[in-house]
Amino acid sequence: MAGANEGDAMSADVKYHVHLNREMLAGAEVAILPGDPGRVGKTARYLDPEAHFLASNREFTSWLATLDGRQVLVCSTGIGGPSVSICVEELAALGITSFYRIGTTGAIQPDIELPCVIITTGAVRLDGASTHYAPLEYPAVADLELTNSLVAAARELGLPHRVGITAACDTFYPGQERYDTFTGYVPRRFQGSLEEWKHLKVLNYEMESATLFVIASVFGLKAAMVASAIVSRTRSETPDDAVLAQAEENLARVMKRALQLRGTARS
């Protein structure tokens, strides 16, 4: 099956940003969404050593894997809600009905050990993109079936994991109250927010889950989120290379087993 690249002419039914069409997806109904394009091939090959490249355009790189006889798409989204919204819109139009977001994260709760697996049940909507689909009163919640598959996988694999609420921000620095920035200043609305989320039992920060959950719910689709903590925000801002490598391996293991437990592409 031929792949596509940024220079290829747009053919019929190829979506503008992801450069994919239904034929390329070969009936896939499940998509795994890492943020980093560099993780796509690794994730796909963990599911299937024969996985192959499909397309790459801007932040959207995609590979197709086969797991237990069913097709699974792995497609990067880049960072943040706006690019996630583009990816979900275009993949949904191509027949994807279930979305698993995977990524790394910063732990808020000080008792979370690295690289703990964190499975999100709902997100604090600190993003802007989700408000273009539903008002702030609308909850950002994960699909129960997909979430349960992740929890069951983590338990079966014996991996330390936590299940709960995530703070989903539009920005990596001020929105997550980081002071190691160009100016060193955090706007007043975010000053003290890390401590507040800690007291409200929010587990972690990331940047995509709220947008993904809201869009999936509005569209009648399914979405879940699993991340691996690579920093503890109450102790450090810089991830260790060994922790990062273990985090990526843990995510791949959990994701593969969750798909197997769920039946891979059953919607």
Predicted regions and their residues:
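Short acidic/glycine-rich loop or secondary-structure boundary segments that cap or lie
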Residues: 108-110, 126-128, 170-177, 234
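A C-terminal functional module that forms or caps the active site or interfaces directly
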Residues: 191-224, 230, 235
